[in-house]
Amino acid sequence: MRHSKRTHCPDWDSRESWGHESYSGSHKRKRRSHSSTQENRHCKPHHQFKDSDCHYLEARCLNERDYRDRRYIDEYRNDYCEGYVPRHYHRDVESTYRIHCSKSSVRSRRSSPKRKRNRPCASHQSHSKSHRRKRSRSIEDDEEGHLICQSGDVLRARYEIVDTLGEGAFGKVVECIDHGMDGLHVAVKIVKNVGRYREAARSEIQVLEHLNSTDPNSVFRCVQMLEWFDHHGHVCIVFELLGLSTYDFIKENSFLPFQIDHIRQMAYQICQSINFLHHNKLTHTDLKPENILFVKSDYVVKYNSKMKRDERTLKNTDIKVVDFGSATYDDEHHSTLVSTRHYRAPEVILALGWSQPCDVWSIGCILIEYYLGFTVFQTHDSKEHLAMMERILGPIPAHMIQKTRKRKYFHHNQLDWDEHSSAGRYVRRRCKPLKEFMLCHDEEHEKLFDLVRRMLEYDPARRITLDEALQHPFFDLLKRK
């Protein structure tokens, strides 16, 4: 029987992954500290593109930003909205796994390209013994409950630790050699020896066991949990080792978007995977580019003469979906607030209740981000988020406004928003009607934007389902092969 009660973690309030620098307090970058007036200053308007120039690489100059603007976009993603308390600690546990579960990913976040094999697994090794909880001569925790370990340590007489892939409030993820499987490299999540984290870990394990047993060959591309075990009070979950997240690939490629044929292949796999969850009465609730990992993130480097720079092109677009720590069954309690801010559906913001359609909205946001190289909803304020939606998608339906208890966002059944305020000017600069984001207007781009528009339908009852999305004309080219 699965757990019906999930553990909250009030001390987790950041969207970031382990591998990223902490971003809180005085270090937060203010939302309007950058000027969007410099965007596209070197680029021609999209209407000047001829049909023959609709190739994705040629149109990408629309998304060229100076270094400061790109750094802003990256940092902005780490500014998780206030007030969101996830049901599980696992959101950033899986974030660590998802972002740093590959060798290429580990190398990318360090100043040196060489791997430091003798580096200890955690900075906690330097803590004095007075800050440790010692259970035996060889097993120690630090004061926060993290297992103290280093390269060469062996878990369960089988998993030899090679390196640390990431660390967070909940625990850490390490890369290991599985000596029980002829030296296979795996990712092992080591959960803190703290009660609420252990309970939440077991809840996630039950979701993973359900999904993996229903789809043992990973046809539907959910990450494979190979096994789990208890290591002196630490729940350890063993995962297959994957490549970079789709977000990290974009980031390491200077925020250049994916080619449209790659978007098609990735989108189809994502829709298949999440549709599998929906048919199993689950809602993922935290879909975003960080939670979509490439099986292998190998690429070729080509010089783009138009943009005068090297750019990376994927060799293989196969993906896996990760982070099931907040996945919710239909018959379980539904927290009022779910999803990462940029991918949060309007029914969640308006506290109207949510179910599987909130995942579809998130996928729509992901696809437009793959297409542009950046998220269109760059905000951490709910009313501003709604204003961005109205700027991009048109007015919020009256019946949703009438039903919401979030009256502070509205006045006379309209969004209470001053377009002439600094926030209003920011939204006006940053956002525009959805179709104006199109890089060109050939048939395949039109089909993609039609699919995205159906996914970003305000009313969840009218939003396209994933069964329907998989039959959308945007995917016709895949079915002909």
From Swiss-Prot:
**Where is composition skewed (Basic and acidic residues) in this entry?**
8-19
Stored PROSITE patterns: PROTEIN_KINASE_ATP, PROTEIN_KINASE_DOM, PROTEIN_KINASE_ST
Q: EC number(s) on record? A: 2.7.12.1
Q: Does the keyword Cytoplasm apply?
A: no
Q: How is it modified after translation?
A: Autophosphorylates on all three types of residues.
Activity regulation per the record? TG003 inhibits its kinase activity and affects the regulation of alternative splicing mediated by phosphorylation of SR proteins.
**Which GO CC annotations does the UniProt entry carry?**
nucleus
Q: In which tissues is it expressed?
A: Expressed in the hippocampus, the cerebellum and the olfactory bulb.
Q: Where is this region: Disordered?
A: 1-47, 102-143
SMART domains in alphabetical order: S_TKc
Tell me the compartments it is located in.
Nucleus
Q: Which reaction does it catalyse?
A: L-seryl-[protein] + ATP = O-phospho-L-seryl-[protein] + ADP + H(+); L-threonyl-[protein] + ATP = O-phospho-L-threonyl-[protein] + ADP + H(+); L-tyrosyl-[protein] + ATP = O-phospho-L-tyrosyl-[protein] + ADP + H(+)
**Annotated Gene3D superfamilies:** Phosphorylase Kinase, domain 1, Transferase(Phosphotransferase) domain 1
**Keyword entries, A-Z:** ATP-binding, Kinase, Nucleotide-binding, Nucleus, Phosphoprotein, Serine/threonine-protein kinase, Transferase, Tyrosine-protein kinase
Q: Which GO terms describe its molecular function?
A: ATP binding; protein serine kinase activity; protein serine/threonine kinase activity; protein serine/threonine/tyrosine kinase activity; protein tyrosine kinase activity
Annotated GO biological processes are:
regulation of RNA splicing
Q: What is its main location?
A: nucleus
Its function?
Dual specificity kinase acting on both serine/threonine and tyrosine-containing substrates. Phosphorylates serine- and arginine-rich (SR) proteins of the spliceosomal complex and may be a constituent of a network of regulatory mechanisms that enable SR proteins to control RNA splicing. Phosphorylates SRSF1 and SRSF3. Required for the regulation of alternative splicing of MAPT/TAU. Regulates the alternative splicing of tissue factor (F3) pre-mRNA in endothelial cells.
What protein family is recorded? Belongs to the protein kinase superfamily. CMGC Ser/Thr protein kinase family. Lammer subfamily.
> Per its record, how is this protein called by name?
Dual specificity protein kinase CLK4
Q: What's the gene?
A: Clk4
